[in-house]
Design a protein with these regions (language model features):
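Topogenic membrane-insertion module of multi-pass membrane proteins
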Residues: 1-80, 201-217, 223, 278-282, ...
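Juxtamembrane helix-capping/reentrant segments at transmembrane boundaries
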Residues: 28, 86, 90-103, 152-156
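Membrane-embedded alpha-helical segments that form the functional core of polytopic membrane enzymes
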Residues: 40-97, 111-116, 124-140, 190-200
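Hydrophobic core segments of alpha-helical transmembrane domains in multi-pass membrane proteins
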Residues: 67-72, 127-135, 193-202, 243-255, ...
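Small-residue-rich segments of transmembrane alpha-helices in multi-pass membrane proteins
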Residues: 99-112, 156-171, 221-232, 273-285, ...
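Hydrophobic alpha-helical transmembrane segments in multi-pass integral membrane proteins
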Residues: 114, 166-180, 232-240, 279-298
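Eukaryotic endomembrane system proteins
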Residues: 119-203
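Alpha-helical transmembrane segments
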Residues: 258-272
């Protein structure tokens, strides 16, 4: 295992302002004894609580828009609190970095889900394509980190996107705001496509920007992109309920991203995406032709991917268990920051 050192370049245009006026003042209210990982876990609970709540809600109201915006705002705040807490208490660790950044992968997908629900956009092909683009942006970020040994966040990234989503959600608390986003403004297309178009463009810029810094096209990322796109394409062709491709694509990306993160800390060769994805595609298409239950195949593959993620996660927790603490020591007793 490599000696740990958090190496990150963050050029976010909003981060300095948010740190000055929101994150830093609010962080002063957090007791220094609370471990940074607990703050990360709280942000995860906020997002998954909101996700589960909306899964069980069909009719939405202004209150739902406010609650979704509140959950996402809380996630953003505590997602930055953990890093600030680790820095102030000199408790930065590989466990904390992986827990923080890997949870962002799935929390980001939940943000997209909540945004689509609040805007009352069908959870169909457009939703799944946006989910996949988000996965690509996250994946290339950590593939680049493994190669360059540096994590890079550009001027317009996930933080800016999430702040925009919060603003959109708040506007939908007023019926006229929701009506505005659903009103056709160009070629008969609704205004919310401006948001989706901007998000899609930012994902592409993230990928191409990474290629420019690497001065190469990482083979494993290209294979991940092609295979995952084929997997998503088959799901769209079969017109499945959104939940099945959402889970399969999310876990497929999550497995690859976690392997890439492992490569950063364990100095492994560039990981390849799961090799069973192609076989699943080949198995599903004949099932559709012979009118067999292809959903079972996809669900089984999703469960397999989840078990892979759990296995890798358990290995990481076991390896870095020394960094887990239930309460931070006093500042004068804290270990030196590496």
């Amino acid at each position: 295992m490599n000696e740990y050192h958090y190496n990150c370049v963050d050029e976010s245009v909003l981060l300095p302002l948010l740190e000055k006026y929101i994150f830093t003042p609010l962080h002063k209210l957090v007791p220094l004894g609370i471990p940074a990982n607990f703050l990360t876990l709280f942000s995860i609970v906020l997002m998954w609580g909101g996700f589960i709540s909306f899964l069980n809600t069909k009719e939405l109201s202004a209150g739902h828009a406010l609650s979704a915006a509140g959950a996402v705002f809380g996630y953003v705040v505590f997602d930055h609190f953990d890093g600030m807490q680790a820095k102030v208490t000199s408790t930065s660790s590989p466990l904390g970095e992986i827990l923080d950044h890997y949870s962002d992968v799935f929390n980001g997908l939940i943000v997209i889900y909540l945004c689509f629900r609040i805007l009352e956009i069908e959870l169909g092909a457009l939703f799944l394509v946006i989910i996949w683009l988000n996965c690509l942006a996250f994946a290339v970020t950590y593939v680049e980190q493994q190669i360059r040994k540096q994590l890079y966040f550009g001027p317009i990234g996930s933080l800016e996107g999430v702040i925009l989503v919060i603003a959109v959600m708040l506007s939908c608390a007023n019926p006229s705001g929701l009506q505005f986003w659903q009103t056709p403004i160009l070629l008969g297309q609704p205004a919310y496509l401006l948001i989706i178009g901007g998000f899609s463009a930012s994902c592409f810029f993230t990928v191409f920007g990474s290629f420019q810094r690497l001065e190469a096209l990482p083979r494993n990322f290209i294979e991940f992109t092609l295979t995952g796109s084929l997997l998503l394409g088959v799901c769209l062709y079969l017109r499945l309920h959104w939940a099945i491709p959402f889970l399969v694509v999310s876990f497929y990306a999550g497995d690859f991203i976690l392997k890439s993160m492992q490569g950063v800390f364990f100095d492994r060769i560039q990981p390849l995406p799961d090799r069973f994805a192609g076989l699943v595609v080949l198995a599903v298409l004949p099932c559709e032709f012979f009118e067999l239950d292809y959903e079972v195949v996809l669900l089984a593959y999703g469960i397999y991917l989840l078990l892979q993620i759990v296995s890798r996660g358990t290995h990481i927790l076991t390896t870095f268990k020394e960094y887990w603490v239930w309460w931070n020591p006093p500042p004068d007793c804290a270990p030196p920051k590496t």
